[in-house]
Amino acid sequence: MAPYRLDVVTLAPQAFAPMGELGVIGRAFHAGRAELVLHNPRDHASDRYRKVDDEPYGGGAGMVLKPEPVFAAFDAIPVCGRRRVLLMTPQGHPLQQADLQRWATDHDQLVLLCGHYEGFDERIRTLADEEVSLGDFVLTGGELPAMTIINGVVRLLPGTVGSAESLVEESHSDGLLEHPHYTRPAEFRGMGVPEVLRSGDHGAIARWRQEQREQRTAARRPDLMQRWQQRFGADNDSEHRA
């Protein structure tokens, strides 16, 4: 089976070097489950100074990423199976777990376009199938959002995480936050582990965890709780917990 291919168009390819060395994501790359390929627009610049930015038409602060080197870098990327092109921009839709699951399941290749400088030429948007943001804030470039997406997608690929069950139970997998976790010791500085978790009653443990997920989501993220209730129906809460 061919590895899941991740192509990144970036002016800072060195920023991605640690991804191949750390934790389960690095092991996934070494095991051939995923492949990371970096493309620097500077390698496609047409002048001897490898210039990739210019002043904005109409004036204004900062420099704008030119379209020619970005398009040239993009055109050099082969299409490998079911490809999706994502543009990293604070104007994009906020990244959700459902996006990561969709990209990991429905596609074999992601192309991640990282902006830089004050912004990018508007024509670069035409390359993208989707525009993605980490939230309502601005970073110096699209590299950190791209790394976030790479991490989130690769960990969902079969074999990356040892237990598939852990992917099902974690926060946002079905719209709810994850339940609390405890390990030894049973008592620490006056704080104890809930008795139900030490009871050995798997049914009671499952019910407790689901109750904790719902309570925690309602308290910390009422927006998620509202969406979850609309999806499953408040009348079906007890059935969903069973």
From Swiss-Prot:
Q: Name one GO molecular function term.
A: tRNA (guanine(37)-N1)-methyltransferase activity
Which GO BP annotation is one of this protein's? tRNA N1-guanine methylation
Q: Where is this region: Disordered?
A: 210-242
Say which domain of life the source belongs to: Bacteria
One GO cellular-component annotation of the UniProt record comes to: cytosol
Q: What is its main location?
A: cytoplasm
Q: Which reaction does it catalyse?
A: guanosine(37) in tRNA + S-adenosyl-L-methionine = N(1)-methylguanosine(37) in tRNA + S-adenosyl-L-homocysteine + H(+)
Q: Where is the composition biased (Basic and acidic residues)?
A: 210-224
**Residues that, per the record, bind S-adenosyl-L-methionine:** 115, 134-139
Q: What class of enzyme is it?
A: transferase
- Per the UniProt record, which EC number(s) apply here? 2.1.1.228
Q: Any idea where this protein resides?
A: Cytoplasm
**Keywords, comma-separated and alphabetical:** Cytoplasm, Methyltransferase, S-adenosyl-L-methionine, Transferase, tRNA processing
Q: Which Pfam families match?
A: tRNA_m1G_MT
Question: Could you describe the subunit structure of this protein?
Answer: Homodimer.
Give the record's family classification: Belongs to the RNA methyltransferase TrmD family.
Q: What does the protein in this record do?
A: Specifically methylates guanosine-37 in various tRNAs.
* Protein name, UniProt field: tRNA (guanine-N(1)-)-methyltransferase
Which gene produces this protein? trmD
